[in-house]
Amino acid sequence: DMEVLPVFDDEAVVAKAHSVTAALIQKHPDVAVIAGFDGSSGGGICPAVREAGKSGTIKVVMNDILPAHMECLKEGTAQYIVGQKRHIFGPIALQTLYDINHSGISFTERDGELGIYPAPDKVDPGFLVVTQDNFEDMDAMVKNLEKL
């Protein structure tokens, strides 16, 4: 049997993520997976898991490919980091703006008046998933970003 626990809000505060995670582990010592969906969550989750002596036992999934999160993965406290493909945000935006102004594609004779543009309404650039298997490549990417 598996029990799914309620969502706990750390309010994007590392210290709160730490205290919430520590309390969660104390109340549910057999918890199998903890996921943090805010960039600040991992910075509190990993130390709490480590302090409880549960590194590697509790699977940790974090959001945002940050240096601190990479350290958690490297040491084995976290197993997965999910991050946006930020490198392509700018190029996609520029291409979209260019297409709106220069594509020559129209749907009606009054596209501009009707708010119709030759571009997608939503763009999903996708995600990167960092694991031990691709750690070295993703770590190099993070270190290159730090130089900018």
Model segments located where?
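Short helix-capping segments at alpha-helix termini
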Residues: 1-2, 26-30, 50-57
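A generic structural signal for alpha->beta connector loops
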Residues: 1-4, 57, 77-78, 126
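Beta-strand segments within the central parallel beta-sheet cores of soluble alpha/beta enzyme folds
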Residues: 5-6, 59-61, 112, 123
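Amphipathic, non-transmembrane alpha-helical secondary structure
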Residues: 15-18, 22-26, 43, 47, ...
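Hinge/cleft segment of the Venus flytrap/periplasmic-binding protein
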Residues: 92-148
